Amino acid sequence: MGVFSGKFIYDKINDVYAFSTKNEQIAYFLQLGIYSSEESMNSDTNSITNKLVIKKNNNYYVYVGISMNKDNLKKVCSLYQKLGYNLYFDEVYIDNKEYLYNLEQFDLLLAKAKSNDEIESINSVILSSYEEMVLNK
């Protein structure tokens, strides 16, 4: 009986340890919209060059920014709000260490960016890096 109790406790501790040492971190995605068809998504977003499209559950999710810092996303958000878009913050867990490290570095740059051109340029690299490093596109 003692062996079984010890094994049970050991397994539970391992489960808790494994959960707490996952490399996932929360990032905030700036969501422009969810579309049920690729045609409607393309029609509504054809003027937006810097975007990330993720297809899941037969829907097309369109994101225009990613950051670990909500204040940085507010900078990006203001660019699209001026164009009349309503945007939403979405929390996403990312477990790609290399991308998370790069995102932290880009967040530092984005925090210091003042002009719209700087913000757009940094944001473009963040989105394309996510496609390349996390989605493997």
Please give the residue ranges for each predicted region.
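Acidic/polar low-complexity segments and flexible, solvent-exposed patches
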Residues: 1-137
